[in-house]
């Protein structure tokens, strides 16, 4: 799939992204951006600690790369408890989830990434565990089968998903706290890039960090990934110091433009503009024009372009906006 090959794709985690764990914030006071989420979580965590309770179950959703796993780690650290991590696709059988739940200590946090991908069988086991801190297990088969209940310690389930709409209503309704992560503002990303540069021992100007932040598509994961590539360029082509000019040269070399678009983003927009006169164009025709699967366009290429106002979905098909025409220096046609 094309997503795995794109430097500016937040949906894939590259091996080098794992190294970012060392520079991730560990407490709320270190957490940058998402001011509403931060202020609310500070209150919820303090209240739970004052009562001596486990934090209520928490659902975190939003685009990939915005720090859902980081926030789960922060919650566990702030509560002073253990964090157990797994993901929806890994929990194939009810017994897999039961094994994790029975090993939790009081108030521990169980983090399930991609929770929308839980199988129905596993999800059924989760309901009484979340609601009553009980595990219902069926022993035996057929007429001899019987159900036993196992009491669980109070715990916090944190579910993370990029597709909140794919969650079933019974599961979604059992989360007492729901937080949506938004794309980051450029000043917050600039701070994150500068902080990462310090951790990496890099000499980087404020303008250099700003240049990387502007092209990071509002996503910390992409910002840190671009920073590593800019570092490589600065060390090989210059003296290792990262200025705005060096950052711009490096990112231009990587085909990441001022809007954070790469070759595939530009290819799609130019196809709509040049081949279909700005649209509307049907998804199948557009897929054929750029030689990509329609699923790739829908899931990988389109979302950011639509969010930033460069592409529009209409009942008749995709249309390039005036902003897209202006981005390429092309005069849009006059509206009839």
Swiss-Prot record:
It is found in: Cytoplasm. Mg(2+) binds at residue 69. The keyword ATP-binding applies. Its main location: cytoplasm. Residues 4-184 are annotated as: Large ATPase domain (RuvB-L). Gene3D superfamilies: 1.10.8.60, P-loop containing nucleotide triphosphate hydrolases (3.40.50.300), Winged helix-like DNA-binding domain superfamily/Winged helix DNA-binding domain (1.10.10.10). It comes from the Bacteria. GO terms for molecular function: ATP binding; ATP hydrolysis activity; four-way junction DNA binding; four-way junction helicase activity. Coiled coil: none annotated. DNA binds at residues 294, 313, 318. Its EC number is 3.6.4.-. Residues 185-255 are annotated as: Small ATPAse domain (RuvB-S). It is an enzyme of class 3 (hydrolase). Transmembrane segments: none annotated. GO terms for cellular component: cytoplasm; Holliday junction resolvase complex. The RuvA-RuvB-RuvC complex processes Holliday junction (HJ) DNA during genetic recombination and DNA repair, while the RuvA-RuvB complex plays an important role in the rescue of blocked DNA replication forks via replication fork reversal (RFR). RuvA specifically binds to HJ cruciform DNA, conferring on it an open structure. The RuvB hexamer acts as an ATP-dependent pump, pulling dsDNA into and through the RuvAB complex. RuvB forms 2 homohexamers on either side of HJ DNA bound by 1 or 2 RuvA tetramers; 4 subunits per hexamer contact DNA at a time. Homohexamer. Forms an RuvA(8)-RuvB(12)-Holliday junction (HJ) complex. HJ DNA is sandwiched between 2 RuvA tetramers; dsDNA enters through RuvA and exits via RuvB. An RuvB hexamer assembles on each DNA strand where it exits the tetramer. Each RuvB hexamer is contacted by two RuvA subunits (via domain III) on 2 adjacent RuvB subunits; this complex drives branch migration. In the full resolvosome a probable DNA-RuvA(4)-RuvB(12)-RuvC(2) complex forms which resolves the HJ. Has 3 domains, the large (RuvB-L) and small ATPase (RuvB-S) domains and the C-terminal head (RuvB-H) domain. The head domain binds DNA, while the ATPase domains jointly bind ATP, ADP or are empty depending on the state of the subunit in the translocation cycle. During a single DNA translocation step the structure of each domain remains the same, but their relative positions change. PANTHER family: HOLLIDAY JUNCTION BRANCH MIGRATION COMPLEX SUBUNIT RUVB (PTHR42848:SF1), PTHR42848. NCBIfam families: PRK00080.1, ruvB. This is Holliday junction branch migration complex subunit RuvB.
